[in-house]
């Protein structure tokens, strides 16, 4: 019996007997009238019109209708009543003709149903444990059974679930009392049977739970790792040769070597460390010496340099030479073409227009900032000045001088607004300038020089208009690497058409002095062999028996600690060190010869073309009558206003002849 409230089938006592009687009754098409009343009664709950139109059908017709209604498939209809009954009720034809046609159709359907029931009984009787099958038509004979209502499509609820023949056979083999009472228990039993037959793939949640269970089992229970094969048994160590136990490391093997070998190895390691330290110190030794020297130079004011200095004439002359270089070569070609032949920029009241292009200048070896005022008086205004120097104390003093210029102190002769300046300690020849922040912002080309790209050599370049190096490049010729690093920094900072201005010792003067002294020394040695007497050296020359060369006067002195070439040609061009002394300025600082031809050949590798080169005294003779530079020399105390003579002693002139100035263009 189907209970809609519990959604289950319940069997009562005597159901099997009634099922058997139903099967026997199905063999007889005209069993009785009571089943017909139940069918019409069940349908009458949903359709009252049927009961009114058929108050009492005959037994033959109702029995056939019962069999047809139970076994025929559901018809597709949108009504809630069985299609066959509703059609029979609502037909408007003659009742006598309709009754005859219904009787014929129901009789044929009853005969087909009787054949099917007979076949079913034969198949069931052949099983090992026969069990009578309950006929669906017999459900109408039960007084407490209510016909299952049809769904919207006309199908009945008892026809929804179909059980295969194998499951029916297995269920029939089980005893009736052990069968689950509810549908839920039967479904669980069925699922258990299906799980025994074949395992379905687990869901994601089951795999997750299985992983957690497995991890817990790994922690708490025995592991299921495969057993690895056992290692082969080791042969026992002979007792007469026990293994000697030692600490790990090289120290454990020291006992195997004699003490003399260990001492010799230790000495070799110490000697190698000393040599490496010497090589490292040689690379930075000169820069350290120069840095310490210039940091120790005391700061003297302008008044002392003009009154008490012993070399005040030489100081003024050197400053005038640097001003001449800045005035002649710092402006670009456009600026010079605009004022060509007019020298309007020389007038104090001639302020350049506001839209005029301003210069970007970097000074390699700026020292204490002694050239700041010279750049402030440049014909083309300066927008940015970057000062680099290896001496930290000099950088501090240069920054203080610049701050004094900004505040109004020392603005003598200034006709342009003060430029922006930045200072930073830096080894300009031994290190790459690309790591300086302000240089990176302005621009520096790392691809200049040999090995650079062709496009960089033609179109590349830095962002500075002028690179200045006053009295400094001779420190770079300690080695070829330093010299090339210096030129790489210069060429990398310069833009196309930029100028490289500088002042350095004149190698022609050094070569002439060295060859002259060596010739006199050789002549004296030849005369000494004849007379066996030594002649006193001439004035200004000092000769030593060990072959060293030295010359100078009371103001300056040059001394070579090594043997110099007899002809005065320095080969190779790098590493020819000498000591230079300048009164009140330089105290025996090591410097290096800058062979000019070798230097010019190196500059060609970095796209630097020589534009100007002259000794100091030649520059004076050429520019002393210039309308701008001539009066400037008088204001700087280089020339006497009354006589026009150069205000320097002969010793100062000799010291000034040791230098020359140059200018290269970036092409």
UniProtKB/Swiss-Prot annotation:
- Cell compartments where the protein resides: Nucleus
Domain named mRNA cap 0 methyltransferase is located at 309-667
Positions with biased composition (Acidic residues): 536-547
Residue ranges with Basic and acidic residues bias: 1-19, 132-142, 256-272, 521-535
Q: Which Pfam families match?
A: mRNA_G-N7_MeTrfase
| E.C. numbers | 2.1.1.56
InterPro entries recorded: mRNA_G-N7_MeTrfase_dom (IPR004971), RG7MT1 (IPR039753), SAM-dependent_MTases_sf (IPR029063)
**Which residues are listed for S-adenosyl-L-methionine binding in this entry?**
322, 365, 389, 427, 470-472, 475
For this record, the Gene Ontology CC terms, alphabetical, are:
nucleus
Q: Looking at the record's lineage, which domain of life comes first?
A: Eukaryota
Q: Which reaction does it catalyse?
A: a 5'-end (5'-triphosphoguanosine)-ribonucleoside in mRNA + S-adenosyl-L-methionine = a 5'-end (N(7)-methyl 5'-triphosphoguanosine)-ribonucleoside in mRNA + S-adenosyl-L-homocysteine
Q: Which segments show compositional bias classed as Low complexity?
A: 72-87
Q: Where does mRNA bind?
A: 318-319
Q: Which UniProt keywords apply?
A: Methyltransferase, mRNA capping, mRNA processing, Nucleus, RNA-binding, S-adenosyl-L-methionine, Transferase
Show the segment(s) annotated as Disordered.
1-272, 521-547
Where is this protein primarily located? nucleus
Q: Where is the composition biased (Polar residues)?
A: 33-52, 88-128, 147-156
Note the site residues: mRNA cap binding: 368, 374, 401, 474, 591, 659
- Signal peptide annotation: none
**GO molecular function list:** mRNA 5'-cap (guanine-N7-)-methyltransferase activity; RNA binding
Any idea what job this protein has? Responsible for methylating the 5'-cap structure of mRNAs.
Question: What family name appears in the similarity comment?
Answer: Belongs to the class I-like SAM-binding methyltransferase superfamily. mRNA cap 0 methyltransferase family.
What's this protein's name?
mRNA cap guanine-N(7) methyltransferase
Identify the coding gene.
abd1
